[in-house]
Design a protein with these regions (language model features):
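Short beta-strand-to-turn element immediately C-terminal to the catalytic PLP-Schiff-base lysine
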Residues: 12, 41-42, 109, 149-153, ...
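Short, basic/aromatic-enriched C-terminal tail that caps enzymatic domains
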Residues: 243-264
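Single conserved hydrophobic/aromatic residue that forms the stacking wall/gate
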Residues: 1-11
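Anion-binding (especially nucleotide phosphate/pyrophosphate-binding) glycine-rich loop
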Residues: 29-68, 90, 172-201
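Acidic, low-complexity central loop/insert segments
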Residues: 64-141, 205-207, 216-243, 250
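Intrinsically disordered, low-complexity, positively charged segments
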Residues: 12-37
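Anionic-ligand binding region
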Residues: 125-141, 148-174, 178-182
Length: 264
């Protein structure tokens, strides 16, 4: 079954490397474990591309198709939960985590949720996002990874979207490495409903960076409650960095045996 956290299914694995084919096999929902992505916990000192502080953990995130992603907001919380349950970090103090999008900090709250810094959010030029028979003007946003955020007019329009097909965009050069696309409906000044199509994955019950990107467009400079298919998350945009808060639960653990020679 899925191994997940609040609407996003991720697997936390040991430090040996994995090929894209390994990742895709593990994430396959019929022949593997089934997941939206894989998290590898690696000592940051062992990661050549990391030039920040040492003595901390690096979150190596892979999409379900095996591609490398800069960041996963919901994955970051389950990563922290995994490290805490394994006794690898102190859950009574703020915990710095290295990611491809930069340094992030996690905080374990008394109510069981976890807050994480998500870095600054930047918005850019409008782009056109299209699905078969429909096109919308979207706002570009960056949360350490690329997003295009579309505001819709009604709950019916949101519910009626067919996200089984990946959205396309113009101009093509806006997102040379692909883009995560968020569709939202504004319910109140500080509450939105959201659906997400993640690059390399498809529609997911939630996407932490997508939640932050949509909140930044819908509730700039404020606080926002975002309801996704997997539940509700809170975004605080009042400071220099966005802060994402939500639950993170380890629902299963076990062993997965790769075919001999599969692991890189």
């Amino acid at each position: 079954r899925d191994i997940g956290v609040t609407g996003v299914q991720t697997c936390a694995l040991p430090i040996f490397d994995l090929s894209p084919a390994d990742v895709a096999a593990i994430c396959d929902r019929r022949s593997g474990i089934g997941a939206d992505g894989i998290l590898r916990a690696v000592a940051a000192d062992r990661v050549p591309e990391w030039d920040g502080p040492g003595g901390i953990w690096f979150m190596d995130y892979r999409n379900a198709d095996g591609s490398i992603a800069e960041m996963c907001g919901n994955g970051l919380r389950v990563f922290l939960r995994h490290l805490a349950e394994q006794g690898l970090v102190d859950d009574t103090a703020d915990v710095p985590i290295a990611t491809r999008a930069g340094l992030r900090t996690g905080r374990f709250l008394r109510d069981g949720r976890i807050s994480t810094t998500m870095g600054p959010v930047t918005t850019g030029d409008p782009v056109t996002i299209a699905l078969p028979g429909h096109a919308w003007t979207a706002t570009s946003a960056n949360v350490g990874n690329p997003h295009a955020v579309v505001r819709l007019g009604s709950e019916g329009e949101l519910a009626g979207l067919d996200l089984g097909t990946a959205p396309t965009w113009t101009p093509l050069e806006a997102y040379p490495d692909g883009v995560n696309v968020e569709f939202y409906v504004q319910r109140t000044a500080d509450r939105i409903h959201l659906r997400v199509h993640e690059r390399g994955v498809g529609e997911t019950p939630s996407c932490g960076t997508g939640v932050v990107a949509a909140a930044a467009v819908a509730c700039p400079g404020g606080r926002c409650i975002v309801r996704v298919l997997g539940g509700e998350l809170e975004v605080d945009l009042t400071g220099p960095e966005a802060v994402l808060t939500g639950p993170a639960v380890i629902v299963a653990s076990g062993e997965y045996r790769l075919a001999e020679g599969d692991a890189a």
